[in-house]
C-alpha cells in the first residue's frame, strides 16, 4: 500500500471508511485487554515459585557472617545479598545498601533525603530555591512523578539511540547550580529500549556540575533483562567511570529484582561511593534497624550466585521474546510503508517506543480504550504528562498472553491507521 501522504483525498477517504468498519467490529467484541504497564505475565511469575520452597520451618536461617536473619539488625543488608545485587551491576559489596522490595521507594527516599537533609552534609535542596532536574524524554513516568511531587522543576532533554543529548546535558549542568540531578535508565531505556553508548557513559562520569551537590540518578532497572541470549548489550560501569574521572560521589545507582522474581516481593539496592554510602547509612539508622533479611536469604539460596540469576533470566527471555517479536511483526505488516509511524526494536527491557504522526497519540490511546484495550496514557512518558508533539506511546507487551497480545496489536494498528487517515483528511480539507 502507498504511503498515506501520497494518497488522493478520495483514496484516503475510502481507506478511512474501511478502517472505521474494522474498528467498529473490534468494538463489538467487548474486549478487555491491557498493555498499560510493564508487568511480568503469570507464566513469568511461575518461574520463581521455587523461591517459596527454599526456606522452611526447619531451614538454617543464619547468614554467612553468623547473623540470625530472623532477628533485628544489619542495616545495609546481609553480605551475600549485597554481593548478589552488586554483581548485577558490577558494584563492590561495600558500595551497596540493600533495602526492601522497591527500587522506586529507594529513589523516592533518595530525592527526599537530598531535599530535606542535603547531600554529604550540604545545604538541603529545598532551601536553595527552585531546584531543577534533567529528564531525558521520552522516559519513565514514575521518575517524573517523584520529582513533580517534590516541586522540582523538570527540564526535557531529548533522547537519542546512544542516550540523552549530552551536549545539552553538559551545558545545563555546567551553567546552572540549581540543576541538581538527572534521571537515567541506561540499559534498555524505558520506553525505547536504547542502550547508552560508552561515550555517553564517559561523558556522564566527566560532567563538571556547577552544583557541588549534583547527582546522577542511574536507575539500572533492566541491567540483566535481555531478550536475546546471544550477545547481550553491555554498558560501562558508571561507578568505575565516575571514580576514574575524579567524581566518585556523583552517582546514585539503583537496582532491584522486581522483574527477576515476584514484583513486590523482591530486593532493591542503592550503590554509590563509600562516602555516599556512609552518609546515607547514618541517616538510615534513624529510619530503620534493617530490612527483610529472611527475603534476602531466600534470594541467595534460590539463585546461589549471579550465574544462577542469569540462567533464570534466560527463561524470562524465552517467554517474552515471542511477544516482542509478534507485536513488532504485526506493526511492520500493518503499518510498514505507510509513513505514519515509527517504533523501536529493542533487544531487552520491557517496552517498545512508538511514535505516531504528531498530534495523534492521545486520540489513538482514546480509541484503543473505547475498543477495550488499555494502553499507557499518552503523555505519560514526559514530565507533567505533556508530550509537546503528542506522538509518543509506550507499548508494554509482556503481561497479556500471546493470543491476547496479537489481537491487541491488530486493534492498535487499526487505531493508528484510522486516526492518521482522519488527521490527513482534515489537513486536505
Language-model segments: residues:
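Conserved PLP-binding active-site segment of the aspartate aminotransferase-like
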Residues: 353-358, 375-410, 414-415
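Glycine-centered flexible beta-alpha turn that most often forms the glycine-rich phosphate-binding loop
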Residues: 219
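Conserved glycine-rich beta-strand-loop-beta hairpin in the small C-terminal domain of fold type I
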Residues: 314-328, 340-355
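Conserved core of the PLP fold type I
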Residues: 61, 67-212, 223-246, 320, ...
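N-terminal "arm"/small-domain region of PLP-dependent enzymes with the aminotransferase-like
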Residues: 2-76, 86-87, 370-373
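Conserved core segment of the aminotransferase class I/II
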Residues: 99, 240-321, 334, 421
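Short amphipathic alpha-helices in soluble, non-transmembrane regions
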Residues: 364-370, 408-413
